[in-house]
Amino acid sequence: MQFSVLAGSLEKMESTAKRLELTGILEELLRETPHEVIAQIVYLIQGKLRPEFEGIELGVAEKLAVRAVSKSSGMPAARIEAAYRRDGDLGRAASSILEQKTQTTFLAEEITVERVYDTLMRIARLEGARSQDMKMRHISSLLNDASPRDACYILKLILGTLRLGIAENTVMDALAAAFTGSKSNRPELERAYNVSSDLGRVAEAVSSGGLEAVRGFAVAVFSPIRPMLADRVRSESEALEKMGAGLAAEYKLDGERVQVHLSGGRVELFSRSLENITAYYPDIVERIPGRLRAREAVLEAEAVAVNEETGEFLPFQELMHRRRKYDIDKAVMRYPITVNFFDILYLDGRDCLGISYSERRALLEGVVDEDSFARCVPVSTIPDESALEDSLENSINAGCEGLMLKLPDAPYRAGSRGGYWLKLKREYRNELGDSLDLVIIGAFFGKGRRTGRYGTLLLATYDDSRDTFPSICKVGTGFTDEDLDQLYQLLSPRVTLKRNPRIDSGMEADVWFDPEVVMEVVASEITLSPVHKTALDSVRKGAGLALRFPKFTGKLRTEKTAEDASTDQEVIALYKSQKKVVPDGQPGV
């Protein structure tokens, strides 16, 4: 497939902020994509080379890309850097420079999607002393044969600066429309994606075999399953109103959610966001096979840091010391853990997703041979509100965050929320001491001591029905100087020249970001807002909801994706459950 076809579609997609138009352009591209290339196309438009859990990254710095453009164009690197500073986009700058190129390559090799993709994969695999020079030569070889427009999008793919605003849901809409005749079939594709976590594989299947091929997807060891998520409740009475008596209450631990895959003594571990984190937990890899009565299994657990002397649980942040490339053995010794299992998704050839929580829990307890390192999360059956209050108090006294509440008869719904699981934490019982996990979508430049940094951040919830990020507040308090420096470093690579199509905001930020970074925020209350877009029209026509006096807690939710952020439905529920409903005119912006 000619790369120019992909580049043309990318150019069209970059020029629109309308989701329906984006989906239509993508659908047209997928229809004309040969089956053998469609997985590559799906990965590339998402800015990836392979699914997230394989951890393949290009590792190309801007300076290296500038050297490659210089080599291909014959122009000094300083001139290219000046054009880059002017345009703010190396792809655009390179396109302009290559249009002025006087030399002609008579024996140019054809630029196809396959060639570009294979070259990028070779670049990603390069390591060692000469790897940077080899990467530069590979990039230059593509640019030598590329048209200016092709070169622009090759560089955007290499540097990860392709800003299309296309999420998995948009890709699945386009795939369903292109190969099954209707977007209404997206749930079938979504189920396949939820058990495989590989949208490229789903695209290959539906493009060649339609819905029948997609229905053949099944749970497989070492292919992570997208985790089931919980809604929140603020009180014991609300939980019982939603679930009824007889619900199961598990302790909610403050650790890292880990999906454990076991086969024949081999263990791999995946995070909540599907990152392969096996290297950070060699103690789990070594010890868990001896604690599980299974040949093959996929289980979910919470890895929690502990004080070995007292046995007490330590905060989640302690686990971050394990996130290092070197001296991991020292970190394991210094920051010991326990592995606390709470669900089983697959066991010795049996897919457990469709069976009830009660059945899964019984299987789990039969599989885990408990000791001080590996155990099952404590659970109890709740007959009434008094018992739920006692269970919450017991969990907090045990050093936990609160409770996870689960319907006994409910299946495991991979990749979704839906009321089958609820979380009840101690702070949710306050007037609005509740914390919310919000996505950073924009920023306003600081003044005074904050000059040269982002002084205030624009935050959003996640609207899962529209797959958008509607704004909910600006936050400028709770930050230390160290926080501001860290956020500037974290957010600067995510700056976009125009607002991401998935962002819904009535404000104009000084800087827009791709919605990727999640932070924890507290506030005094939730108010109606004429400015912010969260839950727009849900409470009052023309009004959204906003946080009043929001404050950063100091906690970045690095384990969460943007789609894991607090939803507009959660905010509506919190607003309605306030003891007094705050009137209009208190926007809390």
Curated annotation (Swiss-Prot):
Molecular functions (GO terms): ATP binding; DNA binding; DNA ligase (ATP) activity; metal ion binding
Protein name, per record: DNA ligase
Domain of life from the UniProt record: Archaea
Pfam family, one: DNA_ligase_A_C
Keywords attached to this entry: ATP-binding, Cell cycle, Cell division, DNA damage, DNA recombination, DNA repair, DNA replication, Ligase, Magnesium, Metal-binding, Nucleotide-binding
Positions annotated to bind ATP: E250, R257, R272, E302, F342, R417, K423
Record keyword Mitochondrion present: no
